[in-house]
Amino acid sequence: CDLGVAVRLVAEVLDEMGLTENTIAATSIGCSVTIYDFINVDSIEAPHGRALAVATGVKRAKPEKCVFTYSGDGDFASIGLAESMHAALRGEKITAICINNTTYGMTGGQLGPTTLLGQVTTTSPTGRNVPYYGYPIKIAEHIAMCDGTAYSARVSLDSVPNIRKAKQAIRKAFEAQEKGLGFGFVEILSSCPTNWRMTPEKAHDRVKNEMMEVFKPGVYKDITENNN
């Protein structure tokens, strides 16, 4: 899958911005939790869905620190939706990275908040349909509508050019925090070949041809340029 690429991008941005030694990561439950094994920053593990609640406490206790969360879409936008939205509404000076792979990856491929219409999962064996399961949530757009949000973007890891764009967006989200402007958010479209039961190549095709048709990449809010 693309989690290794996402972790590398976060690590590169922190290193290039000179923030590594001053950073605290708050992780939650899911595939994303292992980031602390691969990135050399202080970290704290939160209960499922509570990464931004924990990060809020850390940032308020240590406002001089760079604080970020790294979560999956199920963690960020399902069990942790209240914590995520209210951190943005409060304008917490935190950077949040959310990996959207349209499923619960670690627990076996169940339907999640971003599962596409028609997508078959272990808990939607006939495919997601609106009467039973509702619509997939468009996270970046919702976060952008919060007054406390300084930066909200959606990027993809399906190709080298898009990986470069993803790194730029991650940097912007950290810059929003460093400038004290408010909440910074990046939603990253990522493949999950195992639970999608696809080869990595086919999984990247799905990201491009299906996910990006519903979850449009782009910057949905950016006030960093007006506050240099």
Spans of features found by a protein language model:
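Active-site diphosphate/adenylate-binding microenvironment
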Residues: 1-47
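Catalytic-loop motifs flanking and including active-site residues across diverse enzymes
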Residues: 2-6, 50-54, 135, 139
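Glycine-rich phosphate/diphosphate-binding loops that line cofactor/substrate pockets in enzymes
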Residues: 17-19, 61-62, 177-178
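Short coil/turn segments at beta-strand junctions that form active-site/ligand-binding loops
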Residues: 21-23, 65-66, 93, 180-182
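General beta-strand structural signal in soluble alpha/beta enzymes
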Residues: 21-27, 69-70, 96-99, 151-154
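Thiamine diphosphate
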Residues: 31-105, 168-172
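Glycine-rich ThDP/TPP pyrophosphate-binding loop and its adjacent helix/strand module
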Residues: 78-95, 99, 103-228
